[in-house]
């Protein structure tokens, strides 16, 4: 499944 912007945002927040 392609990564969505929301998922990327979550990772950024985790970072």
Curated annotation (Swiss-Prot):
Pollen. It comes from the Eukaryota. Major component of the pollen coat. This is 20 kDa pollen coat protein. It comes from Brassica napus. The lineage of its organism: Eukaryota, Viridiplantae, Streptophyta, Embryophyta, Tracheophyta.
